[in-house]
Amino acid sequence: MASEFWLIVGLGNPGAKYRNTRHNMGFMTVNELAKRWSIHFANHKGLADLGKGTMSLNGQTAKVFLCKPLTYMNDSGQAVQSIREYYHINLDHIVVIHDDMDLEFGRIKLKSGGSAGGHNGIKSIDRCLHSPDYARVRMGVGHASRSGDAHDNTINWVLGEFNAAQRKQLPEFLADGADAAETIVFEGLTKAQDKFNAR
Protein backbone atom coordinates (compact mmCIF):
# COMPACT_ATOMS: atom_id res chain seq x y z
CA MET A 1 0.00 0.00 0.00
CA ALA A 2 1.33 3.43 -0.97
CA SER A 3 2.38 5.74 1.82
CA GLU A 4 0.87 9.19 2.37
CA PHE A 5 4.36 10.52 3.04
CA TRP A 6 6.22 12.83 0.70
CA LEU A 7 9.93 12.34 0.12
CA ILE A 8 11.91 15.55 -0.40
CA VAL A 9 15.48 14.83 -1.49
CA GLY A 10 18.27 17.38 -1.53
CA LEU A 11 21.27 16.39 -3.65
CA GLY A 12 24.86 17.01 -2.61
CA ASN A 13 28.06 15.38 -1.45
CA PRO A 14 28.71 14.46 2.21
CA GLY A 15 31.66 15.85 4.15
CA ALA A 16 32.93 19.22 5.33
CA LYS A 17 34.95 19.98 2.20
CA TYR A 18 31.80 19.95 0.05
CA ARG A 19 29.47 21.70 2.51
CA ASN A 20 29.46 25.14 0.88
CA THR A 21 29.89 24.15 -2.77
CA ARG A 22 27.47 24.87 -5.61
CA HIS A 23 26.80 21.14 -6.03
CA ASN A 24 25.37 21.07 -2.48
CA MET A 25 22.43 23.40 -3.14
CA GLY A 26 20.07 20.48 -2.51
CA PHE A 27 21.58 19.68 0.89
CA MET A 28 21.44 23.35 1.87
CA THR A 29 17.78 23.69 0.86
CA VAL A 30 16.73 20.52 2.69
CA ASN A 31 18.56 21.86 5.76
CA GLU A 32 16.43 25.01 5.46
CA LEU A 33 13.27 22.87 5.42
CA ALA A 34 14.52 20.85 8.41
CA LYS A 35 15.12 24.07 10.34
CA ARG A 36 11.65 25.42 9.52
CA TRP A 37 9.82 22.30 10.59
CA SER A 38 12.13 21.13 13.42
CA ILE A 39 12.97 17.88 11.64
CA HIS A 40 16.03 15.97 12.84
CA PHE A 41 18.10 13.58 10.73
CA ALA A 42 19.14 10.00 11.49
CA ASN A 43 21.04 7.47 9.40
CA HIS A 44 19.10 5.29 6.94
CA LYS A 45 21.02 2.07 6.21
CA GLY A 46 24.26 3.99 5.71
CA LEU A 47 22.81 5.45 2.51
CA ALA A 48 21.29 8.73 3.66
CA ASP A 49 20.58 11.17 6.43
CA LEU A 50 16.80 10.91 6.75
CA GLY A 51 14.43 13.07 8.77
CA LYS A 52 10.73 12.48 9.40
CA GLY A 53 8.20 15.13 10.31
CA THR A 54 5.15 17.20 9.45
CA MET A 55 4.77 20.44 7.50
CA SER A 56 1.73 22.72 7.85
CA LEU A 57 0.59 25.46 5.49
CA ASN A 58 -2.72 27.34 5.23
CA GLY A 59 -4.53 24.82 7.39
CA GLN A 60 -3.14 21.81 5.51
CA THR A 61 -0.64 19.33 6.90
CA ALA A 62 1.65 16.90 5.10
CA LYS A 63 3.85 14.10 6.39
CA VAL A 64 7.35 14.28 4.94
CA PHE A 65 10.70 12.61 4.84
CA LEU A 66 13.69 14.87 4.20
CA CYS A 67 16.64 13.07 2.64
CA LYS A 68 20.32 13.88 2.08
CA PRO A 69 22.02 10.95 0.30
CA LEU A 70 25.40 9.94 1.74
CA THR A 71 26.37 7.99 -1.39
CA TYR A 72 28.08 10.92 -3.13
CA MET A 73 26.32 12.59 -6.01
CA ASN A 74 26.82 9.99 -8.74
CA ASP A 75 25.08 7.24 -6.73
CA SER A 76 22.25 9.32 -5.23
CA GLY A 77 19.65 7.03 -6.79
CA GLN A 78 20.63 4.15 -4.50
CA ALA A 79 19.54 6.12 -1.44
CA VAL A 80 16.35 7.43 -3.04
CA GLN A 81 15.29 3.99 -4.26
CA SER A 82 16.03 2.37 -0.89
CA ILE A 83 13.87 4.90 0.96
CA ARG A 84 11.12 4.76 -1.65
CA GLU A 85 10.89 0.96 -1.43
CA TYR A 86 11.20 0.79 2.37
CA TYR A 87 8.44 3.34 2.98
CA HIS A 88 6.28 2.60 -0.13
CA ILE A 89 6.42 6.15 -1.48
CA ASN A 90 4.76 6.93 -4.82
CA LEU A 91 6.76 8.58 -7.61
CA ASP A 92 4.31 11.50 -7.60
CA HIS A 93 5.21 12.10 -3.94
CA ILE A 94 8.94 12.55 -4.60
CA VAL A 95 10.56 15.99 -4.93
CA VAL A 96 14.28 16.29 -5.75
CA ILE A 97 16.13 19.59 -5.19
CA HIS A 98 19.39 20.11 -7.06
CA ASP A 99 21.84 22.63 -8.50
CA ASP A 100 21.48 23.54 -12.19
CA MET A 101 24.18 25.18 -14.31
CA ASP A 102 21.70 26.09 -17.07
CA LEU A 103 20.06 28.66 -14.79
CA GLU A 104 21.59 31.84 -13.47
CA PHE A 105 22.23 32.05 -9.73
CA GLY A 106 18.98 32.88 -7.97
CA ARG A 107 16.65 31.42 -10.62
CA ILE A 108 14.41 28.45 -9.84
CA LYS A 109 12.63 26.21 -12.34
CA LEU A 110 10.31 23.35 -11.50
CA LYS A 111 9.68 20.35 -13.73
CA SER A 112 8.81 16.68 -13.82
CA GLY A 113 10.30 14.20 -16.27
CA GLY A 114 12.48 15.06 -19.23
CA SER A 115 16.24 15.17 -19.55
CA ALA A 116 18.65 14.96 -16.63
CA GLY A 117 20.46 17.94 -18.17
CA GLY A 118 23.85 16.33 -17.64
CA HIS A 119 23.36 16.20 -13.85
CA ASN A 120 24.87 12.93 -12.58
CA GLY A 121 22.73 12.85 -9.44
CA ILE A 122 19.55 13.09 -11.51
CA LYS A 123 20.85 10.47 -13.96
CA SER A 124 21.41 8.10 -11.03
CA ILE A 125 17.91 8.67 -9.65
CA ASP A 126 16.30 8.20 -13.08
CA ARG A 127 18.21 4.94 -13.49
CA CYS A 128 17.38 3.57 -10.02
CA LEU A 129 13.70 4.59 -10.12
CA HIS A 130 13.38 3.45 -13.77
CA SER A 131 11.61 6.75 -14.43
CA PRO A 132 12.24 10.51 -14.60
CA ASP A 133 8.65 11.25 -13.60
CA TYR A 134 9.13 12.92 -10.23
CA ALA A 135 9.14 16.62 -9.37
CA ARG A 136 12.41 18.54 -9.52
CA VAL A 137 13.35 21.90 -8.04
CA ARG A 138 16.19 23.17 -10.24
CA MET A 139 18.23 25.85 -8.46
CA GLY A 140 20.49 27.98 -10.62
CA VAL A 141 24.20 28.20 -9.92
CA GLY A 142 25.28 29.75 -13.23
CA HIS A 143 27.51 28.20 -15.87
CA ALA A 144 31.17 27.26 -15.83
CA SER A 145 33.56 28.83 -18.32
CA ARG A 146 33.13 27.37 -21.80
CA SER A 147 36.75 27.95 -22.77
CA GLY A 148 39.49 25.32 -22.41
CA ASP A 149 38.58 21.91 -21.02
CA ALA A 150 34.80 21.98 -20.55
CA HIS A 151 34.74 18.84 -18.38
CA ASP A 152 37.37 20.14 -15.96
CA ASN A 153 35.70 23.55 -15.92
CA THR A 154 32.38 21.98 -14.96
CA ILE A 155 33.84 19.90 -12.13
CA ASN A 156 35.78 22.86 -10.74
CA TRP A 157 32.69 25.05 -10.98
CA VAL A 158 30.18 22.79 -9.23
CA LEU A 159 32.71 21.84 -6.55
CA GLY A 160 33.65 25.49 -6.07
CA GLU A 161 32.09 27.87 -3.56
CA PHE A 162 29.87 30.90 -4.13
CA ASN A 163 31.39 34.35 -4.46
CA ALA A 164 30.92 36.99 -1.77
CA ALA A 165 27.90 38.65 -3.41
CA GLN A 166 26.17 35.30 -3.88
CA ARG A 167 26.85 34.27 -0.30
CA LYS A 168 24.92 37.34 0.84
CA GLN A 169 21.96 36.35 -1.34
CA LEU A 170 22.15 32.64 -0.50
CA PRO A 171 19.82 32.60 2.56
CA GLU A 172 17.01 34.21 0.53
CA PHE A 173 17.64 31.84 -2.40
CA LEU A 174 17.54 28.78 -0.14
CA ALA A 175 14.30 30.06 1.41
CA ASP A 176 12.82 30.38 -2.10
CA GLY A 177 13.88 26.80 -2.90
CA ALA A 178 12.26 25.56 0.31
CA ASP A 179 9.10 27.53 -0.54
CA ALA A 180 9.05 25.90 -3.99
CA ALA A 181 9.23 22.39 -2.52
CA GLU A 182 6.45 23.22 -0.03
CA THR A 183 4.28 24.62 -2.83
CA ILE A 184 4.63 21.39 -4.82
CA VAL A 185 3.52 19.40 -1.76
CA PHE A 186 0.57 21.61 -0.83
CA GLU A 187 -0.63 23.03 -4.16
CA GLY A 188 0.69 20.65 -6.80
CA LEU A 189 3.40 20.97 -9.43
CA THR A 190 1.40 22.99 -11.98
CA LYS A 191 0.54 25.78 -9.53
CA ALA A 192 4.09 25.73 -8.21
CA GLN A 193 5.45 26.10 -11.76
CA ASP A 194 3.14 29.07 -12.37
CA LYS A 195 4.42 30.69 -9.20
CA PHE A 196 8.17 30.08 -9.55
CA ASN A 197 9.08 29.47 -13.21
CA ALA A 198 8.13 32.96 -14.38
CA ARG A 199 10.36 34.74 -11.84
Curated annotation (Swiss-Prot):
GO terms for biological process: protein quality control for misfolded or incompletely synthesized proteins; rescue of stalled ribosome. The keyword Secreted does not apply. TRNA binds at residues 18, 72, 74, 120. Its EC number is 3.1.1.29. It is found in: Cytoplasm. The active site is at 23 (proton acceptor). GO terms for molecular function: peptidyl-tRNA hydrolase activity; tRNA binding. The record marks 99 as: Stabilizes the basic form of H active site to accept a proton. Belongs to the PTH family. This is Peptidyl-tRNA hydrolase. The gene is pth.
